[in-house]
From Swiss-Prot:
Subunit and partners: Part of the 30S ribosomal subunit.
Native source organism of the sequence: Eimeria tenella
Pfam families referenced in this protein's UniProt entry, alphabetically: Ribosomal_S4 (PF00163), S4 (PF01479)
Homology family: Belongs to the universal ribosomal protein uS4 family.
GO biological process, one term: ribosomal small subunit biogenesis
Keyword check for rRNA-binding: yes
Name the UniProt record assigns to this protein: Small ribosomal subunit protein uS4c
GO cellular component, one term: apicoplast
Keyword list, A-Z: Apicoplast, Plastid, Ribonucleoprotein, Ribosomal protein, RNA-binding, rRNA-binding
Domain S4 RNA-binding: 88-148
Amino acid sequence: MLRYLGPKLKKLKRLNIHMQPEFSTKYFILNTNKYNNKMILSFYLLELFEKQKLKFTFSLSEKIIKKYILFMHKYNYKKFNLINIIEIRLDNTIFNLGYSITIAQAKQLIIHGYFFVNFKLIKIPSFLLKKGDIITLSPKSYYIFKLCKKNLYKKYIKNSNIYDTIYICKNTLISIIYSILNIYNNNNYNNILIMKYYSY
C-alpha cells in the first residue's frame, strides 16, 4: 500500500487540498497564499501540480495512474474521465460512504477483510465498482457498525446524492450504489491537464 510518511498538513496546504473536515478553512487561506505568491506557474508546472494533487489525495502510484490511462485508451471510455474511474475505486467509495475517516484507513480496512461487494469478500482497494453493486460489512467489523449506527461519521459523508443511505439490517450495514456517472468532486481536479502531462 502506497503511503506518504512526510508532513501531511504542509503537503495539503502546498497542493491546496481540502481533504480533512476538521482542518480550519481560515488556516488554509492564510497559508496557501504564501505558496501561490512565490510561484511563477508555467503550463507544465500546472500539469505537474494537478498530477501531484491527484496522487496525494487518493494515494496512487505512477504505475496505477498510467494503467488507468491505458485502460481508457484501449476501451474508448467516453462516459468516464480519469477522475471518474479513480472515484469509483472501492477504497474511495468506502471513504465517501463514511465508513472511514481517511482513504488510508479505508484501504487498511479493505485489506484486512472488513467489506463484501455483492456478498463476496474483496481485499483489493483498487477494485472498481459499478452501478447496482452492494457493499456490506463483515460480521467482525462490529465496532464500525456501532459508530455508523450512532451517526458519528455523518460529518464526513460528502456525496449523499450518489450513494443511497446506509441500510441497517440486523447486525450489518448495506450500501447500494445507484449512480456512478456524476461523481462529487471537492478539489476540482483538472482532467485535461493530467492527461496532457502523461501524453509527453
